[in-house]
Amino acid sequence: MSSRGYEAVIGIEIHVQLSTKTKIFSSESTAFEAGDNENTSPVSVGMPGTLPVLNSKVVEYSIKTGLALGCDIRRKSVFARKNYFYPDLPKGYQISQYDQPICENGSITFKVDGKEKTVSITRAHMEEDAGKSNHHGEYTLINYNRSGIPLLEVVSGPDMRTPQEAAEYARTIRQIVRYLDVCDGNLEEGSLRCDCNVSVRKEGAKQFGTKVEIKNINSFRFVEKAIEYEIERQIDCVERGDKIIQETRLWDPDKNRTFSMRAKEDAQDYRYFPDPDLQPVIVTDSMIEKYKKELPELPIARAQRFQDDHALPELDATVLTTEKDLADFYEDTAKESKNFKASSNWIMTELLRELNSANKNIKDSPIKPAQLGKMIAMIDKGTISGKIAKTIFQEMWASGNDPEVIMKEKGLVQISDPAAIEKLVDEVLAANAQTVEDHKSGKKKNLFGFFVGAVMKASKGQANPDLVNKILLEKLK
């Protein structure tokens, strides 16, 4: 991003809350809706004499995420203690990973404004979450339910230059972890949190400027807005001759600005050292091969397959692969209908509109893929028209019934008998003799659509429109 002769340098740390049933080092539930301090134990609140035991699912989910991000998986990684004091960190240290993380040297590619962008993944490391401080005027309450929740912190390289690239990078990470089913990606509940590191430098300069970290960002729109604000703030500082302080700032969505929170610590301030209570994590080749085989087809590859094998436009393929459940729904529909583009069209227009209007996700759709696929096949066979299909679709949405059942109950079978349609056409032409004369003489133009509409109305929308057009063309010569 070029602004007033400056270039932004952006990196993002994304804390992915892994969807395990229990915490990283203890057996309490990770359920979000639990009451305050309900999901705690002597381990998660740091009582003396307690020992952590690593949850193996955390290792599995971390390796799968690393593989999906193209990372190298360390055969031996080490937990370290990150030492700092804060009321919601009862042990006085956080168990994390430092110089030997489980995943390193990956990258992801995505599109921004139609152009491909590749961002490096420096590392992804396992760690425990801290508790949560709730500030109430003169006092603070602490909820330790979150203490010990398993996180995988995914750290990008400083490769992004615009707020739009940063937001799309974060969206892509969320899309991948949701495809893997290792995180629900709920930003509002904090199961995916973005910390953005921003600096500015003169265009063409090679040296990085002073980095500022922005926290408290809980939507992708705010990722863009917070970075946009911070870029302009830093440029203003430089042009005034002020020194940019290495600090952590909070994004305030109500005021659309960032505020200073605290001076930003360097790694040496945390006095990292290997945790003596935890063994190194040993990853074998057989584990990696097993998890590779269990990986789903990832969104970019799936979208490309939809374009190559199903001849779908890029827009369709991109929309349909936004969520794994949506892509699955499309494939199941197309398998039943044998019509890729029609399946895409019905899902992207009719179904997604109804889902959005009802605030439902694809899993909650009352219309199942097999039902939608059958309805599309009925159109292609000429059993029903597109107009009848829309009526059946609405009935399917309301009742969840199969399209054949609705068609029979409502008498919605398409009339495809040429003799029956010819009879309807003759009746319409006889009832509109003057209009027929006007059409044939050329006195009035563009009347053909009137006759089509009249025949369709007479048939209550059940006449085969192709046959109606064909017979009318013959009779109106």
Swiss-Prot record:
<dbReference type="InterPro" id="IPR014746">
    <property type="entry name" value="Gln_synth/guanido_kin_cat_dom"/>
</dbReference>
<comment type="similarity">
    <text>Belongs to the GatB/GatE family. GatB subfamily.</text>
</comment>
<keyword id="KW-0648">Protein biosynthesis</keyword>
<keyword id="KW-0436">Ligase</keyword>
<dbReference type="Pfam" id="PF02637">
    <property type="entry name" value="GatB_Yqey"/>
</dbReference>
<dbReference type="GO" id="GO:0050567">
    <property type="term" value="F:glutaminyl-tRNA synthase (glutamine-hydrolyzing) activity"/>
</dbReference>
<dbReference type="GO" id="GO:0005524">
    <property type="term" value="F:ATP binding"/>
</dbReference>
<comment type="subunit">
    <text>Heterotrimer of A, B and C subunits.</text>
</comment>
<dbReference type="InterPro" id="IPR004413">
    <property type="entry name" value="GatB"/>
</dbReference>
<comment type="function">
    <text>Allows the formation of correctly charged Asn-tRNA(Asn) or Gln-tRNA(Gln) through the transamidation of misacylated Asp-tRNA(Asn) or Glu-tRNA(Gln) in organisms which lack either or both of asparaginyl-tRNA or glutaminyl-tRNA synthetases. The reaction takes place in the presence of glutamine and ATP through an activated phospho-Asp-tRNA(Asn) or phospho-Glu-tRNA(Gln).</text>
</comment>
<dbReference type="InterPro" id="IPR017959">
    <property type="entry name" value="Asn/Gln-tRNA_amidoTrfase_suB/E"/>
</dbReference>
<dbReference type="InterPro" id="IPR023168">
    <property type="entry name" value="GatB_Yqey_C_2"/>
</dbReference>
<keyword id="KW-0067">ATP-binding</keyword>
<dbReference type="GO" id="GO:0070681">
    <property type="term" value="P:glutaminyl-tRNAGln biosynthesis via transamidation"/>
</dbReference>
<dbReference type="GO" id="GO:0006412">
    <property type="term" value="P:translation"/>
</dbReference>
<keyword id="KW-0547">Nucleotide-binding</keyword>
<dbReference type="GO" id="GO:0050566">
    <property type="term" value="F:asparaginyl-tRNA synthase (glutamine-hydrolyzing) activity"/>
</dbReference>
<dbReference type="InterPro" id="IPR042114">
    <property type="entry name" value="GatB_C_1"/>
</dbReference>
<dbReference type="InterPro" id="IPR003789">
    <property type="entry name" value="Asn/Gln_tRNA_amidoTrase-B-like"/>
</dbReference>
<dbReference type="Pfam" id="PF02934">
    <property type="entry name" value="GatB_N"/>
</dbReference>
<dbReference type="InterPro" id="IPR006075">
    <property type="entry name" value="Asn/Gln-tRNA_Trfase_suB/E_cat"/>
</dbReference>
<dbReference type="InterPro" id="IPR017958">
    <property type="entry name" value="Gln-tRNA_amidoTrfase_suB_CS"/>
</dbReference>
<dbReference type="InterPro" id="IPR018027">
    <property type="entry name" value="Asn/Gln_amidotransferase"/>
</dbReference>
<protein>
    <recommendedName>
        <fullName>Aspartyl/glutamyl-tRNA(Asn/Gln) amidotransferase subunit B</fullName>
        <ecNumber>6.3.5.-</ecNumber>
    </recommendedName>
</protein>
